[in-house]
Amino acid sequence: MVSYKEAGVNIEEGYKSVDLIKKHASKTFTKGVLNNLGSFAGMFELPKYKNPVLVSGTDGVGTKLDIAFRMKKYNTVGIDCVAMCVNDILCHGAKPLFFLDYIACGKLEAEVAAQLVEGVSNGCIQSECALIGGETAEMPGFYRDGEYDIAGFAVGIAEKDEIIDGSKIEDGDILIGIASSGPHSNGYSLIRKLVEDLHKDFAGDKIGNTLLAPTKIYVKPVMKLLEKYNIKGMAHVTGGGFYENIPRMFKDDFTAVINKKSYPIPNIFNHLMSLGVEENHMYNTFNMGIGFVLCVNEKDGENIIKDLIEMGEKGYKIGYVKKGDKSVELI
């Protein structure tokens, strides 16, 4: 007789991972959570809104995971997974409510799964949302031993008449960029071709550790700004860099004019460019040091930057909006 374990699925290791995961997930629970992990579904009670709209987003971490495999560091990519989802729904003014994750692997190692979910829980705490469920799939023969994939799904909420959709953006509005923590979770297929030795020294650390810096979560500072200012549009700078993402906030035909010298380019991007990538391709692939962009009235710009600094963020006036063709112009 052949057992499930002999086929490559270790149920006991699965039980162990669930127990380890529960202690991390419970730290994220907020008022709306109605049940513990282990049920068939997660339940969340909606807060009192006049005309609520649910806003959802899903994403993964991509080939940044390969850096984590090779560095044997597993507790940061969970933060990336949350960040990629909650920063997207934040662009429409939505407050994150809850999150679900999905982890797939060839051979389940409970301690590794627990480190992954520790990162997810950390990201949920940073974004003030609850981790209410997930799935860990052991798929022998499908993934190589030591490899895994992680993806997530976030749900947030906004008042219908407060949704940010770019419809109020005007000619002459300014663009404020909030600093990133590095490449975040995009461009890693290119990075892996450029950087072979992850243990090479870079700025006093191994370059592999620099490349694993988790994606910054912008929820707390941006939600505070939304309480004070008329923010007309927002963009999460992910795959495709400035060119792909900034125009996504425009409902009408505008062009974003970005001054490349308006903020300091982090050293990691200059290093990657020195390895043979053209500057224009850098801006079309990476966030280049700006992870989130706000479109606001010019009169509010100075105060917003001041508030960001007080909240521990770095904000810069990086450009302005003019009539155009849903494009980006770098100067």
UniProtKB/Swiss-Prot annotation:
List where in the cell it is found.
Answer: Cytoplasm
Catalysed reactions listed for this entry = 2-formamido-N(1)-(5-O-phospho-beta-D-ribosyl)acetamidine + ATP = 5-amino-1-(5-phospho-beta-D-ribosyl)imidazole + ADP + phosphate + H(+)
EC supergroup of this enzyme: ligase
Q: Which UniProt keywords apply?
A: ATP-binding, Cytoplasm, Ligase, Nucleotide-binding, Purine biosynthesis
A single GO CC term for this protein reads: cytosol
This one is known as: Phosphoribosylformylglycinamidine cyclo-ligase
Q: Which Pfam families match?
A: AIRS (PF00586), AIRS_C (PF02769)
Q: Which family does it belong to?
A: Belongs to the AIR synthase family.
Q: Which GO terms describe its biological process?
A: 'de novo' IMP biosynthetic process; adenine biosynthetic process
Gene3D superfamilies from the entry?
PurM-like C-terminal domain, PurM-like, N-terminal domain
